[in-house]
Amino acid sequence: MTSVVVVGTQWGDEGKGKITDFLSANAEVIARYQGGDNAGHTIVIDGKKFKLHLIPSGIFFPEKISVIGNGMVVNPKSLVKELSYLHEEGVTTDNLRISDRAHVILPYHIELDRLQEEAKGDNKIGTTIKGIGPAYMDKAARVGIRIADLLDKDIFRERLERNLAEKNRLFEKLYDSKAIVFDDIFEEYYEYGQQIKKYVIDTSVILNDALDNGKRVLFEGAQGVMLDIDQGTYPFVTSSNPVAGGVTIGSGVGPSKIDKVVGVCKAYTSRVGDGPFPTELFDEVGERIREVGHEYGTTTGRPRRVGWFDSVVMRHSRRVSGITNLSLNSIDVLSGLDTVKICVAYDLDGQRIDYYPASLEQLKRCKPIYEELPGWSEDITGVRNLEDLPENARNYVRRVSELVGVRISTFSVGPGREQTNILESVWS
């Protein structure tokens, strides 16, 4: 039995899809365990970009099983669209399995997401307006509709009528907005359910059987640790648990069956939306990193905020996710800079701290304490071994590993599969 969890260690967009795709070559089952279509991942195969939001990266390996776990919230309309996109590109989806326990995102979730965000005014949290939060709210309130319910027409009708009655009271009375008409969505979404029916199964059984039979299982997280609802920069977080612990809840696999946790990070930091970001850059260096790194959201298209590598954030992520290995991406983006910086601690009201505060007010007052390293000018996109990196780039990689306290198993010098280099196999 070997199972590996891939988690983002920053605020998402670290290149998890690329690393999952890379590690999938040696896995037999690939599963997602949380989130929805609010997070996008981009995979480059033979120079062609594929952008996915719901379906695991392993779908590009037809001989492997790809799983949408019970911890996800699934917009059936988005899922059917994504399946059609893959079919048009010649990608088979016969290897997809969808948990019958996953919850369903419906139009009223998206509308409520929009209205709640608008009502916050200047205190917006930067939601993607995909209905993720309201769907998880319904799940916690025990009024959610699951995939299993969607497939049964009578049950779906009864639960949709009940939920719409409640949500429409909110829309009309609280938000002074239009009600959603039952007939406008019932048949449409029931039909989506019928289109995905052949993929639906108890995925916990599949995953546990695979592990019990010695197969390699890869768990793919969405977003990142710093967006975790418990461990992230609350309330500027997502509504689920991207941390490695989320696997056990979101997949139905017990914690004793998790072997390794790979933390994915970039050689710098980025985030989309509002919230604390101690190392954020507002100068020409930040603009250069954004442009060279193509830092625009896969889902929203919004320019990402960028900053220097933050080892305080990384140590927090290592601790709360039990990270055993690190995948360091986008080293090439820093090429051409005379000096590169790493945040090693914060100055909080004149006191040096090496932990990430829970208080937003304290975070606002935190000033990064940097360690400066000499940069490198060489084009490193063709490098295939650590020893072939320029000395300064090599020193940067080693310093990142030292500060985070985790060994680096892969490093990447570009978006392609062939640009990910192995230092140590996580499957051994």
From Swiss-Prot:
* Reaction(s) the record says it catalyses: IMP + L-aspartate + GTP = N(6)-(1,2-dicarboxyethyl)-AMP + GDP + phosphate + 2 H(+)
SUPFAM superfamilies reported in the protein's UniProt record: P-loop containing nucleoside triphosphate hydrolases
Essential cofactor(s):
Mg(2+)
Binding-site list for Mg(2+): 13, 40
Reported EC number(s) for this entry are: 6.3.4.4
- What molecular function terms (GO) are annotated for this protein? adenylosuccinate synthase activity; GTP binding; magnesium ion binding
Arranged from A to Z, the UniProt key words for this protein are: Cytoplasm, GTP-binding, Ligase, Magnesium, Metal-binding, Nucleotide-binding, Purine biosynthesis
Localization in the cell:
Cytoplasm
Q: Which domain of life is it from?
A: Bacteria
Q: What does this protein do?
A: Plays an important role in the de novo pathway of purine nucleotide biosynthesis. Catalyzes the first committed step in the biosynthesis of AMP from IMP.
Q: Which family does it belong to?
A: Belongs to the adenylosuccinate synthetase family.
Read off the PANTHER family from this record. ADENYLOSUCCINATE SYNTHETASE (PTHR11846:SF0)
Protein name (database record):
Adenylosuccinate synthetase
